[in-house]
């Protein structure tokens, strides 16, 4: 089996996240993409806008129509969500020889050298790095990377939050996620 971890705050999840997961699934013949909303990401301490349970539910709604996608609460209740801890938990659930990938945006990948035990992360997974408009990155020699450069989708969760706060209808937000965000008064 080939599985990709796709971690993020998903605050909220949007069409860019889904397009990246679909492209990675197709291009690298992934059996599953495991979306793991971060409970308390160390690089965004105190910055999440929607509560964890709401972010998980929005991810579930966004992923429900693709059998390759699964949403996990693996980081629920953790004090801080470090990638190496998540990778080790996922690896323990896989059979020997299963392929483990890490799907990530170029903006987040650019910070890899600041991650806890980043060289262990680099040894544990193969990175699938999705280009983001305006973001460049260098690839450390210790890291195995496949680039996904064909998807420069100019959608950001922060822009979606601003549009929702202004009462608008943001582009790139799945309809079920938009309905959930409005029904639960998120991002007002």
Curated annotation (Swiss-Prot):
Q: Where are the transmembrane segments?
A: none
Q: What is its EC number?
A: 2.7.7.18
Q: Which UniProt keywords apply?
A: ATP-binding, NAD, Nucleotide-binding, Nucleotidyltransferase, Pyridine nucleotide biosynthesis, Transferase
User: What CDD domains does the entry give?
Assistant: NMNAT
Q: Catalytic activity, per the record? A: nicotinate beta-D-ribonucleotide + ATP + H(+) = deamido-NAD(+) + diphosphate
GO BP annotations listed: NAD biosynthetic process
The superkingdom of the source organism is Bacteria
Gene name linked to the record: nadD
What is this protein for, i.e. what is its function? Catalyzes the reversible adenylation of nicotinate mononucleotide (NaMN) to nicotinic acid adenine dinucleotide (NaAD).
As for family, the record states: Belongs to the NadD family.
- GO molecular-function annotation terms? ATP binding; nicotinate-nucleotide adenylyltransferase activity
Q: Which organism is it from?
A: Solibacter usitatus (strain Ellin6076)
Matching InterPro entries: Cyt_trans-like (IPR004821), NadD/NMNAT (IPR005248), Rossmann-like_a/b/a_fold (IPR014729)
What's the top EC group for this one? transferase
Write out the pathway annotation from the protein's UniProt entry.
Answer: Cofactor biosynthesis; NAD(+) biosynthesis; deamido-NAD(+) from nicotinate D-ribonucleotide: step 1/1
What protein name is recorded for this chain? Answer: Probable nicotinate-nucleotide adenylyltransferase
Q: Which residues form a coiled coil?
A: none
């Amino acid at each position: 089996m080939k599985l990709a971890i796709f971690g993020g705050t998903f605050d909220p999840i949007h069409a860019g996240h889904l397009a990246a997961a679909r492209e990675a699934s197709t291009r690298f013949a992934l059996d599953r993409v495991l979306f793991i909303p971060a409970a308390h990401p160390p690089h965004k301490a105190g910055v999440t806008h929607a509560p964890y349970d709401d972010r998980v539910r929005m991810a579930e709604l966004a992923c429900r129509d693709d059998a390759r996608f699964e949403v996990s609460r693996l980081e629920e209740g953790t004090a801080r969500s470090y990638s190496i801890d998540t990778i080790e938990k996922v690896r323990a659930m896989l059979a020997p020889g299963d392929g483990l990938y890490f799907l990530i945006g170029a903006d987040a990948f650019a910070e890899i050298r600041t991650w806890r035990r980043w060289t262990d992360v680099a040894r544990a997974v193969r990175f699938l790095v999705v280009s983001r408009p305006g973001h460049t990155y260098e690839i450390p020699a210790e890291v195995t990377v496949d680039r996904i450069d064909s998807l420069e989708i100019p959608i950001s969760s922060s822009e979606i939050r601003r549009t929702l706060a202004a009462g608008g209808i943001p582009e790139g937000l799945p309809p079920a996620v938009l309905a959930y965000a409005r029904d639960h008064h998120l991002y007002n």
